[in-house]
């Protein structure tokens, strides 16, 4: 049991058709997907999972929420949900955890390039910057998704593609995925 206070914000809404909900994991092993990061990655580790497990203790400021980008993301998803195969937040564990959870159970791997995410690979993988979403779109819809997000004013980074070998590769290096 943690002894640190945790502020919790809850949001409740009504979804008219639950069949239109975007899953947080890949829905089909038969498709090829392009993985895209929406939003800016910053050097923000205050209160993060990494900070907690590294023994550094929880300290510093939490990631700053970009309300303007949150609004742009909400508009993007409201108007484009049909083209998104899966989406995952990056709030707990950063990009590394989001990619793992997206792939889990799909028998898919991925080939990722982090160059456009952040200059520092560690920050790119583990930062918990707010106002970011990892999305998977079928590869034939990737260009259209990038165009829609860019025209909505959202920073877009194409990370790479899924593979059928079940292996995650980051910058050409294999990453062991353990359940």
Model-derived segments and their meaning:
Residues 1-46, 161:
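Glycine-rich anion-binding loops of enzyme active sites
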